[in-house]
């Protein structure tokens, strides 16, 4: 654990529906004392339904509490046994509703995506915004399988990476070295301990 977690650093976690992987990482980073937001890049929020061919689909912005109550009315037993109700209960304690990345106006220092298509969507969206602020953002993908167990494993690994980045920024400021010159070393060191979580990196701009 770092001696000082800088709450001025702005972190963001992103998955497809802003319900499982991004929200578990949101929770873990927030509990560690970091400034964190979370988003989804999908066209809608999709959660498993009562049959494989009929997922539950909601618009971004639909409160987690409303989704929870909808699933509760469909089948409390089914959605409790597959963990969806517990997941939504966690989510509604963190924020009101799933948010869509493409509608976000916040500016972040680091964006952690949880699968490659989300990484691509974030990078493409930032490129389309045109980089008018000339503010660098480090987009890092950590490939996490979309289930409860892997979301928990992935979130701990993301916290570890956030701590390493946090410490390196502090060290670079003391030594008057550009952080951008050091980030690949951090990612390489982190990846060597997490071979089961393939990562990607792209610097982008707001």
From Swiss-Prot:
EC number: 3.1.3.16
Localization per Swiss-Prot or TrEMBL: Nucleus
GO BP term (any one): mRNA 3'-end processing
Coiled-coil segments on the chain, per record: none
Enzymatic reactions: O-phospho-L-seryl-[protein] + H2O = L-seryl-[protein] + phosphate; O-phospho-L-threonyl-[protein] + H2O = L-threonyl-[protein] + phosphate
Keyword line: Hydrolase, mRNA processing, Nucleus, Protein phosphatase
Domain of life the protein comes from: Eukaryota
Primary location class: nucleus
Task performed by this protein: Component of the cleavage and polyadenylation factor (CPF) complex, which plays a key role in polyadenylation-dependent pre-mRNA 3'-end formation and cooperates with cleavage factors including the CFIA complex and NAB4/CFIB. Component of the APT complex, which may be involved in polyadenylation-independent transcript 3'-end formation. SSU72 is required for 3'-end formation of snoRNAs.
Quaternary structure and partners: Component of the cleavage and polyadenylation factor (CPF) complex, which is composed of PTI1, SYC1, SSU72, GLC7, MPE1, REF2, PFS2, PTA1, YSH1/BRR5, SWD2, CFT2/YDH1, YTH1, CFT1/YHH1, FIP1 and PAP1. Component of the APT complex, which is a subcomplex of CPF, and is composed of PTI1, SYC1, SSU72, GLC7, REF2, PTA1 and SWD2.
Family as reported in the entry's similarity comment: Belongs to the SSU72 phosphatase family.
Protein name: RNA polymerase II subunit A C-terminal domain phosphatase SSU72
């Amino acid at each position: 654990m770092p001696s000082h977690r800088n709450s001025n650093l702005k972190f963001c976690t992103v998955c497809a529906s802003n319900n499982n992987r991004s929200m578990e990482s949101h929770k873990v980073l927030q509990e560690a004392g970091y400034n964190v937001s979370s988003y989804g890049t999908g066209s809608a929020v999709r959660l498993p339904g009562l049959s494989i061919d009929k997922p539950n689909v909601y618009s971004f912005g639909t409160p987690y509490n409303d989704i929870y109550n909808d699933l509760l009315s469909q089948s409390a037993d089914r959605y409790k046994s597959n963990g969806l109700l517990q997941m939504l209960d966690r989510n509604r304690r963190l924020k009101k509703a799933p948010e869509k990345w493409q509608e976000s106006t916040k500016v972040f220092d680091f964006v952690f995506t949880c699968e490659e298509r989300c990484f691509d969507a974030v990078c493409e969206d930032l490129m389309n915004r045109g980089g008018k602020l000339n503010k660098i953002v480090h987009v890092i993908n950590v490939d996490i399988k979309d289930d409860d167990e892997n979301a928990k494993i992935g979130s701990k690994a993301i916290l570890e990476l956030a701590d390493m980045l946090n410490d390196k920024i502090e060290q670079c400021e003391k030594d008057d070295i550009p952080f951008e010159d050091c980030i690949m070393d951090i990612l390489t060191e982190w990846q060597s301990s997490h071979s089961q979580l393939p990562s990607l990196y792209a610097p982008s701009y707001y």
